[in-house]
């Protein structure tokens, strides 16, 4: 599993946008287009499983109503920027399981090294 953690974003953000990024009012964060473009140049993503119809980064995407956790990601190259709340563990578990099946999954997540999901699902992958 490929994993990009939030410190990659910090280098690209100003103080103003960084403050917005770490607000606790929401657990959803739009990926800066410039960051996505750099990653997409390398990976050629085909699926965004954690999207809204307004912030989808790939032509194929799943919204909350479609529940990307219940979908099969086989044959896809996945860009995943999951909600950063408690449900992140379920998303990381899904990404890990799909990666074991051979799916490339790049996750944009906070570096919460004190959590189980980090140790169980992020640490076995490639962290950038």
Predicted regions and their residues:
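Class I S-adenosyl-L-methionine-dependent methyltransferase catalytic core
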Residues: 2-128
